[in-house]
Amino acid sequence: MTTARLKNSAIVGGVASALILAGAAITAAQAKTVKVELTAKEVTAPSDNEGHTFLAWTYNGQIPGPLIRATEGDTIEFTLKNDAANKKSHSIDMHSMRTDVLTNFASIKPGETKTFSYVPDHAGVFFYHCGSDPMIQHISRGMIGAVIVDPKDPDAMPKADREYVLIEHQMFDNPEDVDGMMANKWKHDAFNAVPFQYDPVHDEHATQTLEAKPGERVRIYLVNAGPNEFSGFHPIAGIWDRVYPSGNPKNVLVGMQNYTLAPGDAATFDLISPTEGANALVNHSMRAALSGAIAIVMFSNKADPSMGHGDKILVR
């Protein structure tokens, strides 16, 4: 190699290295810290649309717990508190995290606090729940939630016009009956903890539906919290435009009528309706659907613009 070529090679290499370093610096600068605080609370919560209640175990007094959202590469600083007024030990199991189960996911007693941080390195939608013994009871009584990790590449998926989070789980008649839970004697299957919460067709006491306009891309994040049943997720009168198993943009299926999630699994579903009218999102296991796992999406040119955005992504 001549001296001139050597100099040119060095210059090109130096520029390339500088660009790589600059890109790394930009990526580091874009990454942010997301602080999450959850408090385990044993409270009274609604069990249907008519005002009946049960003694629930929750995160922050809500079922599901708060939606946790970050971008791939962010740092999540997490704190779990077990309210001193509680009677039980509680914990966290985050499916978006790779860690030591014996430390970060260990139970804490009433009045105790646990903190840790992690960097979510896989984009997608993930389940979080209490892992304390008996886990089946902690899940069924309400200690469930969702984590959305958005891809760091904003163009990795088509842009959604609206987003909704649905967390499906079985509800048991007696929340103290662990043997009944193990025997799978559930009474209701519900989206976001209230049977038929978004279905005034099957429950006259239901007061809300999900909303969108025709032609909009509606993105549904479904978490199957179980604790026991699979979910065959189908949009009646529609077809899933795209399905992303685990919500990862690298996993994409097109034109699906139904997609099945195991207990503890999650996926992202895109739905587009060309016309006004209704689609019914169901677990196509009829026992599950007819005991509560139905959510109506109303497609209307007059759809509420706030629905599917901000605090109306997880509609309570």
Predicted regions and their residues:
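Histidine- and aromatic-enriched segments that form or immediately flank copper-ligand environments
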Residues: 34-39, 43-148, 228-261, 279-298
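Acidic-aromatic/histidine active-site loop/patch
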Residues: 162-214
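Boundary at the C-terminal end of the N-terminal hydrophobic targeting segment
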Residues: 28-31
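Bacterial N-terminal signal peptides that target proteins for export
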Residues: 2-15
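Bacterial N-terminal signal peptides
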Residues: 13-24
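Extracytoplasmic/periplasmic copper-protein system
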Residues: 33, 42, 140-175, 246, ...
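Short, glycine/small-residue-enriched coil/turn segments at secondary-structure junctions
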Residues: 63-76, 203-217
